Swiss-Prot record:
Source organism, top-level taxon: Bacteria
Organism, as annotated: Rhodopirellula baltica (strain DSM 10527 / NCIMB 13988 / SH1)
Pfam families in the record: GKRP_SIS_N (PF22645)
Domain SIS, residue spans: 57-220
Source lineage: Bacteria, Pseudomonadati, Planctomycetota, Planctomycetia, Pirellulales
Protein name in UniProt: N-acetylmuramic acid 6-phosphate etherase
Name of the gene encoding the protein in the UniProt record: murQ
Amino acid sequence: MLNQLNQLTTEASNPASAQIDSLSALQIVQLINQQDALVAAAVNTQAEMIAEAVDVIADRFRSNGRLIYLGAGTSGRLGVLDASECPPTFRTPPEMVVGVIAGGPEALTRAIEGAEDHPEFAERDLAKINLSSNDVLVGIATSGRTPYVIGGLKYARSIGAFTIGLSCNPNCQLRPLSQIMIAPIVGPEIVSGSTRMKAGTATKMVLNMLTTGAMIRIGKTYGNRMVDVRATNEKLVARSRQMLSEIVGISGDQAEQLLQQCDGEVKTAIVVHIKEVSPQTARQMLVDVDGHLSRLLATPSE
């Protein structure tokens, strides 16, 4: 175990922070920020693999497949976080993007001792959510050696699911199990081995790209507007009203009335206004173009 850890980039000592305990608060903050500035460049080296993954995920979404994140500790929490943001942002069903964490929901708020050390637990957890050959499994392990994640990837391969590995160590144990391997090398952490820092930031950046990219590819935005937003609070209600008002050129009051007619669906409301059809017809028109509003609006009205 010790020899394995010594070989991991994420476990190495960072020379830049060797004397960090003698620095002032301002110097500590500046040093952390300087190190964080390296993360985006590391993620950018993986752009082609991330883009390939985006297209695979979008294809699975189109055939009613799911995106499943699997991880332990920080990696698992980040997967659950990204998955939980998809329903309000893109009006997706909760089961379309799912985060699975070693130790279950309790592990979101506290460490569950030994949860990540059992590969067989991953098979059990994935079987519970009925992982299928139509799904994509993203195994997240910044170290690249977490038994729980390795077990999950092996199980996913055995049933024919598409596998993607995400690690911050280059030649890791996830690689031979992953059809696409994403490995941004962020280097040693400010606090040695504390992968909630740079590695965690890189992980969150990649997950943002995977879900956002795939959702854009399946028509969940209009330009850069989140027209499939589910308005679950006052902020999102106001955003929906403003978005509709700006896109179709009507007042805020008119936008509010139109949204009420369309059950709060911005995309439907846009079609109703521009194409002069009923909400029911607008929804069917969107289905006919696989939800791509820009494609629909480019079609002349009959």
